Amino acid sequence: MSLDIAKYPTLALAENPEELRMLPKESLPKLCDELRQYLLTCVSRSSGHFASGLGVVELTVALHYVYNTPFDHLIWDVGHQAYPHKILTGRRDRISTIRQKDGLHPFPWRGESEYDVLSVGHSSTSISAGLGMAVAAEREGKGRRTVCVIGDGAITAGMAFEAMSHAGDIHSDMLVILNDNGMSISENVGGLNNHLAQLLSGKLYASLREGGKKAFSALPPIKDLLKRTEEHLKGMVVPSTLFEELGFNYIGPVDGHDVHTLTQTLKNMRDLKSPQLLHIMTKKGKGYAPAEKDPIGWHAVPKFDPASGTLPKSQSSLPTYSKIFGEWLCETAAKDSKLMAVTPAMREGSGMVRFSREYPQQYFDVAIAEQHAVTFAAGLAIGGYKPVVAIYSTFLQRAYDQLIHDVAIQNLPVLFAIDRGGLVGADGQTHQGAFDLSFMRCIPNMVIMAPSDENECRQMLYTGYHHNGPAAVRYPRGNGTSAVLEPLEMLPIGKGVLRREGEKIAILCFGTLLAQAQLAAENLNATLVDMRFVKPLDEELVLEMAAKHQVLVTVEENAIMGGAGSGVNELLMAKRRWVPVLNIGLPDLFVPQGEQDEMRSELGLDAAGIQRQIEAWLA
């Protein structure tokens, strides 16, 4: 799909930042309008992250207009908002391929463009990486500048504050732009603020500020008076002195949709020394009314008709695993007031909207703070409550020490509902749930369950909730299999189920690839086992299968290295059972983006691929 660039005459003149910087500043508002419309048209035809990009159009134009990218380093935190950046950095004609197999990466990606200096996907990494780049630039001595753009959600994470504290301590020259689109920090925006922001970011003010500090540093009373005077002036525009206390010079808030004000303020700040923070106010979904009204719903979208202003409904009548979890959560909370649900800013994605509304006193959204979420849950458990931590597989990686140190060592009854286990699709390498079975399996006291369908998912959630110790239920992104939902009951811990009896080959399946393994088993006349528990492993059943079959095959949608199949290998070796084992799962690579079924086919994890791998191994 390609768009007629003639419909966007100003944008056509800015194929890259060098061309953009040649435009007269009077044309920038027109460029922003065309860029926003181009983004709207492209994403509506191809799908992708949407509302965040609409909100940073003016900022993106201003940054590339003022800074000498790619020589100057521009770092986008998370990267959901980077579509306008990609359009302006030589990738305009390929933007319709974003998030698709072999297309543009959904986030800034170092291997894709010299303008993407940091590969991202997870939040709150920009300031740490930016500080490292700023230190390197200072030692390089070529005048290279460093700019980090971070949102008001991502900046709440501990890592961001750790980085700012370090930056303030070593006084490195860098600019952090706080893109505040949630009104969570300040609503104090207007013409006066824009004017004062330009004044406070100017060279005269900066030189007077630093010169005054040096001149009166030996006179504490005068120094304190000057500091109070400065704070009084800034008090008209600054919502908090937090950033100043961390060692940053705070400027703002500035209207993030006034491209001329942004451009002038950035020019003023470009040559300032020491850490600087520019606070801009933006509207997520800016320029498209439905997205402005519901920025969460329009955060990431399928193909849609811009004229209708509505998103298409899901074609599947089957519930997602996230919805299954959310309904189980509500069902359990109705009977047990001790249940406490915790999520690190993933309410919608984890299926917790209904629960948050019906049981607000039992619901905790701790923001982007995965480490805190897990240890907070540990505290709830110590206090006699029953915490359930709903978290994506890829984000649990960020709380690994807390999982071990604060939950497992103390053998606390915390249930982890791990969503997006396995291949997640369009978000690619940074979001695949490829490693959780591997990194949890080695932790003592953990019970790890992998359901094969939505009914097993419910039973396992129930089992893990009532288990007196740490437990994890790991389920995929996507819809269920239309399994009949049975009354909830405790599953016997560490016991699998024989699904099909065959000959010579026994397929041991962990998780929702069971349906694909079933088809392969039928074609090969193989035995099929739904293992259900990754830990504790059903050792008795594995040894029985080893005794009755010539070969074993393990199947999982997790990294082969250290995964469930590795547990089978370890058991057989420990028991001196010399049975050949084929481990089928995710290979030793970071799996790129692509539709889930598309990537399963490529990796040999669909029915045909499983059968093909087994036949090739036996040949």
UniProtKB/Swiss-Prot annotation:
Organism encoding this protein: Yersinia pestis
GO MF: 1-deoxy-D-xylulose-5-phosphate synthase activity; magnesium ion binding; thiamine pyrophosphate binding
Gene assigned in the entry: dxs
Cofactor requirement: Mg(2+); thiamine diphosphate
Residue positions binding thiamine diphosphate: H80, G121, H122, S123, G153, A154, N181, Y288, E370
Cofactor comment: Binds 1 Mg(2+) ion per subunit.
HAMAP family xrefs: DXP_synth
Binding-site list for Mg(2+): D152, N181
Pathway named in the protein's UniProt entry: Metabolic intermediate biosynthesis; 1-deoxy-D-xylulose 5-phosphate biosynthesis; 1-deoxy-D-xylulose 5-phosphate from D-glyceraldehyde 3-phosphate and pyruvate: step 1/1
Subunit (UniProt): Homodimer.
Keyword tags: Isoprene biosynthesis, Magnesium, Metal-binding, Thiamine biosynthesis, Thiamine pyrophosphate, Transferase
Listed name of the protein: 1-deoxy-D-xylulose-5-phosphate synthase
